[in-house]
Amino acid sequence: MLFEPTTLRSLSLRNRVVMSPMTRSRAVEANTPNALMAEYYAQRAGAGLIITEGTSPSPNGLGYARIPGLYNASQAAGWKLVTDAVHAKGGKIVIQLMHTGRVSHAANLPAGAEVVGPTAAVLPGEMYTDSKGMQPHSAPRAMTQADIDHVVAEYAASAQLAIEAGFDGVELHGANGYLIEQFLNGNVNQRTDGYGGSAAGRNRFALEVVRAVAKRIGAGKVGIRVSPHGVFNATGPFDGVDEQYVALVKELSAIGLLYLHQLDHSAMGAPAVPAGIKAALRDAFKGPYILAGGFDRASGEKALQSGQADLVAYGRPFISNPDLVERLKKDVALTAPDFSTFYTPGAKGYTDYAVQTA
């Protein structure tokens, strides 16, 4: 099933292999996509669906060095280079919109931008900046109602730009401890207003973003990525997490989204997401379901055959194997990635991995 054509709502896909979103930090000029990024994604257009790296809908969401944005015309033009290149190879591509929230340092933000989050609690640990090296995370300003309304509007405007730039859809990043999950997670969200204090309160921001984006570009063009039980960026399980996410996903299902994307980081050393919640979310979402997390050919095929997923997402193997689909199909050995070039500017470790299956 892995290599069979399929449909994702109105999209026709050449196979059920998805390229997972992965930060690569190559948007070196004003957080704007470029020809090098277009080449990178076009090399990987053999995937049934590409999900881009996390892309900020706001200057305030550019927490990491050199990640791309999509909130102005020049960034939209840069992304048009990418979508044109992928479509020229017969691929399909959606953009992942990711506001980093408190996972940020002010040195990584453009002039006039600020670090914001659900509360003023600082994320423990450090992050890399080009100008100052490793630095403790910056203190966020707690978002007001006006801030929340503004960010929701930024997501909708960015989604509109995405469609104008030629994307086949948009994925909202609701995992890995970034802004949407900062509201969802009971360990992080300590608000006492209508955006916290209960499961419904914690779900509210995510649903407002989803509904605003769906209203702007159509629900059938909007996917979302979630990871209950994820531990990235000081999240982690909390009391009632399973019940909260089932309630969230039932509401998302009723909106009629493009897909639900469930992430499990256990292959990278994090605790596994319990099988029960994966199955519960699969049951709660009446639409296409993508699973990600450490799959190879055999386990990906098993997930499809057993009905656990409709599509299977692969991450790091795509970094060093641009022809991953053909390698999996022909059982060709995979090239190991160079971890030292994951986030460095330039072509090395980005567009210079060889194709072995031509």
Specify the residue positions occupied by each region the protein language model found:
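Flavin-dependent oxidoreductase catalytic cores
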Residues: 1-358
